[in-house]
Amino acid sequence: MSGEVLSQNEIDALLSAISTGEMDAEELKKEEKEKKVKVYDFKRALRFSKDQIRSLTRIHDNFARLLTTHFSAQLRTYIHISVSSVDQVPYEEFIRSIPNMTILNLFDVHPMEGRIMMEVNPTIAYTMMDRVMGGIGISHNKVDSLTEIETKIISNLFENALGNYKEAWQSIADIEPEMTEFEVNPQFVQMVSPNETVVVISLNTQIGEISGVINLCIPHIVLEPLIPKLSVHYWMQSDRNEPKPEETKSLEKRIMTAQIPVVAELGTSELTIEEFLSLEVGDCITLDKSVTDPLTVLVGDKPKFLGQAGRVNRKQAVQILDHDIRGEQDGE
């Protein structure tokens, strides 16, 4: 029998059919013993193991994080990109699944053979372009009538992001992505034969209230030389290796540009619940510091410096006077 669970009505109907002779119990047993034949679709031949798909997911999770940081900085707004699915399908099926008119970026990945296609939902592409041109991120889906300037802006946006793809693959292979073609009609692009297996990585992309999908289509021929490295065993070995100097330098560069909150604290005070509930506009709260005491400057939530309040160019400011001993004692 299959793994399906019958309802009570179905069980009653089955017992009734057996008891009345409408169904032969021996015949059911015979069918159960017979070998089941599973239909195999040669057009959907699975050429990547689950282990290899997991490795590709891990690589592109990293790529999604890098893209999030890259585009957030480029467009000066918060963007969230994440992997939603990783599938292997025939190339023809992938082409049928995307819009008739869309944004297609094709790039080589030297030294591997073949090309990778990045399909960007027009809604996402136009929202990005609007942000680059100083807008608030409004999408106008008119991909069939892209001007030469619009084409250049969109292609440059994604060409500049290819460095992140190189970085995402660093633990597996040293690749050099290079944009080679920009197209809007999928029917004009023939990377591989229709039945060739491709891996499709779908990236959910959120820009403010606008959402869409970026698809990466990677033919089997591109990944074939790397298949031995797409395994958990290889990942475990590479994780134990010492980081490469360029990886350390890249990490240091990203840390140096990270932003952390800095707060100049005037002072603190303690109130009873009764006092807190009775606070009104105009009430004064006495702090624990004298007007001549230096301010505590917090980096993150740790005291790091002592400072003096002042003004610079009509804005409030704080001048660093000394290190805060408390922060040094804590080893911060």
From Swiss-Prot:
Protein topology in the membrane: Peripheral membrane protein
A single MF term (Gene Ontology): cytoskeletal motor activity
Domain of life: Bacteria
One of the Pfam families matching this protein, by short name: FliM
Subcellular location: Cell membrane; Bacterial flagellum basal body
GO terms under biological process: bacterial-type flagellum assembly; bacterial-type flagellum-dependent swarming motility; positive chemotaxis
Keyword vocabulary terms for this entry: Bacterial flagellum, Cell membrane, Chemotaxis, Flagellar rotation, Membrane
Main localization, broad class: membrane
GO cellular component: bacterial-type flagellum basal body; plasma membrane
UniProt similarity note: Belongs to the FliM family.
NCBIfam families assigned to the protein according to its UniProt record, in alphabetical order: fliM_switch
Function: One of the proteins that forms a switch complex that is proposed to be located at the base of the basal body. This complex interacts with chemotaxis proteins (such as CheY) in addition to contacting components of the motor that determine the direction of flagellar rotation.
Name of this protein: Flagellar motor switch protein FliM
Organism: Bacillus subtilis (strain 168)
